[in-house]
C-alpha cells in the first residue's frame, strides 16, 4: 500500500507524567520526562536507554537511533517524546558500539570494532527486558540506519513476539556499487590475513569510517539487496513493515521508493519532509506514526 500524508497540523502534545523510579539519574535528562536506564549486559558492558513507562497491556515500543547516533539525536528524541503521549511504554536504547555506558554520538573517525550482530544482541537485551516488565509483544521503530537494525533483528529472531516494524527514512547503500565492491574485497583480504588493523572505509554518511575488517564487513553486508531480502522474508511471514519517508529526502531516490512499495506493507510519503532532521515536519511524522499504531492495534482489539 502507498499513501501520502499532507497533514499540516502541528499539534501540541500533552506531557505525560512518568514515575521517576530511575536506575540512574544524570544531571541533565536528555529526553523530556524520560528516565534513563543503565543496565549491565551479559558481556559486562553497561547499556543505556531512555525509558517512559506506559500501559503494560499494550505492546511496548523500542525506538532505535540512526548510524553512530544516540537517543539524544533530535529526530530520535522527538519520536520518543511524541509516541510517549499515546500511552505506550517506550524504550530508546543507545547501541553501545563497544563503549560501556555510551551516551554521546560516535565520530566516524573513532576506532570501530563493533559489529552489526553485536548491535542485534543489544536490541535483544532490551526486548528481553521489556518482556520481563510484562509486555507480551513489541513494536520496533527505527530511524535511518536504525531501520536496518530493526529489520535485521526481526528477521533473525522469528520467535520474538514483534508485532510490527516501522522504518522511518529507510536508507539505501550510499556508496556506488564499484566503490563498495572494492572496499569489501580489500576488507575480506585483510580478514583472511588476520589483519585486524583499523582502516578507513566509506560507509553510510561516513567518508572515513575507521573500522576493523570484521566491523566494516558486518555493516557493508546490509546493502540494498540485503534490505529487500529482509523485507521479502518478513512479507512471507506476514509480519507488517511500515515505511515512512520524506518527499525531499536526498538520501533516497524514486527507484528505492518503488522497491519499498513492492516489499513493505505500507509506504507513506510526507510531503516536503527531508530525512526528518528538521523539526518542521515533526508533527506530521508523529501523526503518521499514531495512525500506523492504530492500524497495528486494530486486529488485536478485534476491530
Over which residues does each language-model region extend?
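Short beta-to-alpha linker loops that shape the active-site pocket of alpha/beta-hydrolase fold enzymes
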Residues: 94-101, 171, 273-274
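Bacterial N-terminal signal peptides
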Residues: 19-28
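Cap/lid segment of the alpha/beta-hydrolase catalytic domain
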Residues: 97-114
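N-terminal cap/lid segment of alpha/beta-hydrolase-fold proteins
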Residues: 33-54
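Alpha/beta-hydrolase active-site loop
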Residues: 111-132
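Gly/Ala-rich beta-loop-alpha elbow adjacent to hydrolase catalytic centers
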Residues: 142-146, 150
